[in-house]
Amino acid sequence: MNPLDELRRRIDALDEKLVELLNERASCAMRIGDIKHQLGMEIYQPEREAEVLGHVRALGAALGGPLGGDALTRVFERIIDEARRLERESTSENKAPHDAGAGG
């Protein structure tokens, strides 16, 4: 196998792991959305999002690698956006029919 094919196979394997981890993270986000709903909390928690992004930037700096803090922040902003969407969908699906007209 030539080096290009080897690297592409490695990327495919890494992508598989990333998808598994992203789905695991998404499942956690959906459970968090349910808990927030039960506690009457807002889905959007700017302090927590800032904490996550700061943690990611710190990990990037500590671990090094070609992706700098700005790139990692952009990637995780998208991940967080999708997690927030899933939290909203999860809570709207779990509302009882009599809650649907309650205005949020």
Predicted regions and their residues:
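Domain-level signature for soluble enzymes in the chorismate/prephenate branch of the shikimate pathway
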Residues: 1-104
